[in-house]
């Protein structure tokens, strides 16, 4: 399917092009093009508009995107923005998802109490599924799939997604402070006359939380080289993905590989990581697709 390629340097371009994809992509149109029929979506079917109808019926808040669809729509967006820089552009993809819902189902955007909902984008059907031991530093921040066996799951906890902080010096409220997998306070007070950088109080009424679960995943037994011990990795599940995995399950996980400093203050309630190994870093896989 023809599409204007996105300039991957700009997040707004990613938002605009991804929104166009959600609004217009039709697998029936793509199949007609592949068959040489030349018909331009004669039925008017649009995959993600139809999916939104199901989300509305089920009160869902996650849009599942077939990566093959995105490649057909715009290869530059798929490979250079989403696949190569998923962690960087994820907020812009979610912004497009919110606008998509607002355009087609405005009643879904807010909870009954009037607070705005958070919407998520999850990708499935990537071209390659890695073995766990194939994940390296070069994969950090990319959209990647790997297969493994679940060995342990944690309880579900609330995670602080966007924090609102009140300055302890002048009482100024700083909203929507993005949390980077650890407890993150504002860099500086918004009050130009204050300059506070250190003293903050969390304003819970203005915060946004999401369900969070830690899952331990080990290499599949068939993939462990002879004479080697199986490797494992922590996977973070969020929102509708929590409680979907059980010990013993074999699954494909799609998301982004992150490096989290050991001993960094966590933004997961009740979660504490002891400093060890001289402050070494650990790999963590943030799930954003298949499960």
What are these regions (language model features)?
Residues 290-291:
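Charged, amphipathic alpha-helical linker segments immediately N-terminal to NTP-binding catalytic cores
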Residues 1-250, 254-274, 278, 285:
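Long, low-complexity, serine/threonine- and charged-residue-rich intrinsically disordered N-terminal tails
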């Amino acid at each position: 399917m023809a599409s204007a390629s996105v300039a991957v340097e700009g997040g707004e371009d990613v938002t605009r092009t991804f929104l166009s994809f959600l609004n217009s992509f039709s697998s029936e149109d793509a199949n007609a093009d592949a068959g040489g029929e030349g018909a331009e979506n004669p039925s008017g079917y649009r995959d993600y508009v139809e999916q939104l109808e199901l989300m509305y019926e089920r009160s869902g808040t996650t849009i599942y995107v077939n990566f093959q669809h995105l490649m057909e729509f715009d290869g530059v967006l798929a490979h250079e923005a989403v696949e190569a820089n998923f962690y960087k552009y994820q907020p812009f993809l979610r912004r497009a998802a919110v606008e998509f819902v607002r355009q087609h189902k405005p009643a879904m955007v807010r909870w009954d109490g009037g607070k705005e909902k958070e919407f998520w984008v999850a990708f499935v059907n990537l071209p390659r599924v890695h073995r766990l031991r194939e994940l390296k530093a070069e994969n950090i921040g990319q959209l990647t799939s790997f297969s493994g066996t679940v060995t342990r799951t944690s309880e579900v906890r609330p995670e602080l997604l966007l924090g609102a902080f009140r300055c302890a010096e002048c009482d100024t409220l700083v909203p929507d402070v993005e949390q980077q997998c650890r407890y993150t306070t504002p860099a500086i007070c918004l009050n130009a006359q204050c300059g506070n950088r250190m003293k903050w109080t969390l304003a819970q009424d203005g915060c946004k939380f999401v369900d969070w679960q830690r899952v331990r995943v080990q290499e599949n037994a068939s993939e462990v080289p002879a004479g080697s011990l199986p490797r494992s990795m922590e996977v973070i599940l969020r929102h509708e993905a929590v409680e979907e995995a059980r010990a013993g399950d074999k699954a494909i996980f799609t998301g982004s590989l992150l490096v989290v400093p050991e001993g960094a203050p966590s933004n997961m309630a009740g979660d504490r990581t002891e400093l060890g190994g001289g402050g070494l870093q650990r790999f963590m896989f943030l799930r954003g697709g298949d499960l």
